[in-house]
Amino acid sequence: MNKKSIRDVELAGKRVFCRVDFNVPMQDGVITDDTRIRAAVPTIRFMMEAGAKVILASHFGRPKGQVVEEMRLTPVAAHLSSLLGKDVRKLEDCQGADVEAAVERMESGDVILLENVRFHAGEEKNDPELAKSFAALADLFVNDAFGTAHRAHASTAGIAEYIPAVAGLLMEKEIRFMGGALSNPERPFTAIVGGAKVKDKIAVIENLLTKVDHLIIGGGMANTFLKAQGYGIGASLCEDDKLDLARTLMEQAKERGVQLLMPVDVVVADRFAADAEKQVVAIDAIPEGWMALDIGPKTVEQYHSVIVDSKTVVWNGPMGVFEMDAFAGGTIGVAKAMAACSGTTIIGGGDSVAAVEKAGVAEQMTHISTGGGASLEFMEGKELPGVAVLADNQ
């Protein structure tokens, strides 16, 4: 997947409509985690230094097509100004005469932030009129919001019908690592899939089984696979309606020569609580009434040896109830194995990101994806609308 990026186009003097993902956690008007804003800075700087007029657009929260005062992007503009060391003017809307006039007055290297695009109902409906009004502001569309690339909205896909579209640096990195791992991985290629439910990851597992050498399963979903193999799982979470599917997936792995790794031991608890009584047991010895809440130390050891010997590893989803320290050992163990792997290590969004941060090894990962749902759909092999509209590199 080879898409044009801002490195491949002339930016000097050009008006650039850049879609970013500034949907950051905020409490009482204070940003509590600015990761997404910081992630967009290299792209913004690159365009500023190249002499572009940078028009930033983002959604924030779910205002459902209404103006919601608490969902204005004013705190984001202030924070971005301090990160860039340059004043970023925040406009009161994202379309209309005032916006057009403000863009008209821009000089090369200027940056403005449009108001929350989801204040307009047309954004999520991919309304052509709204998309046209965005396109009218600029000469070029840059998509740097991988986190919303799975949505065909006016500011992520619709706008590209009317002006040329290329990737920002963050989007370029996502396509390079996520796309590269899935289309042309260095082998052995290992995927680690965790999380509570099989149903959330069916399409991911099905797609990965056509690509990987090893597939590691953990988290609550492992219980369903264990029960499908005939193990008693006590009071553990299980999707009884997915037992046949689990058997089918295991059969597919066998047919394709994929090594499927399951827990050999688990940490069980007498109830679902941080202070529950817990013990480590083999998977054929889960006591009646107890529940598996994490993978055990022998399992971590086995997973570790496969991970460190891999040339490409993609991870999505925790190995246990890692929000509770008592059941975080398996997830932390896998995070440390990823850090010890000298190959390409990719964290496919969601809870796994929090896990590598908790383990203190985030810096050692090759790539941490910024997309939750987008990463998941990418791993499912779906074409993402926000990526599909970008110009191909010939």
UniProtKB/Swiss-Prot annotation:
Pathway: Carbohydrate degradation; glycolysis; pyruvate from D-glyceraldehyde 3-phosphate: step 2/5
Source species, domain of life: Bacteria
Gene Ontology cellular component list: cytosol
Binding of substrate, residues: 21-23, 36, 59-62, 118, 151
One GO MF term: phosphoglycerate kinase activity
UniProt xrefs under PROSITE patterns: PGLYCERATE_KINASE
GO biological-process terms attached to the record: gluconeogenesis; glycolytic process
Chief location: cytoplasm
EC number: 2.7.2.3
Chain positions recorded as ATP binding sites: 201, 323, 349-352
Record-annotated membrane-spanning stretches: none
Localization of this protein: Cytoplasm
Catalytic activity entry: (2R)-3-phosphoglycerate + ATP = (2R)-3-phospho-glyceroyl phosphate + ADP
Keywords of this entry: ATP-binding, Cytoplasm, Glycolysis, Kinase, Nucleotide-binding, Transferase
Top-level EC class: transferase
Family: Belongs to the phosphoglycerate kinase family.
Subunit structure: Monomer.
Protein name (database record): Phosphoglycerate kinase
Gene name of the record: pgk
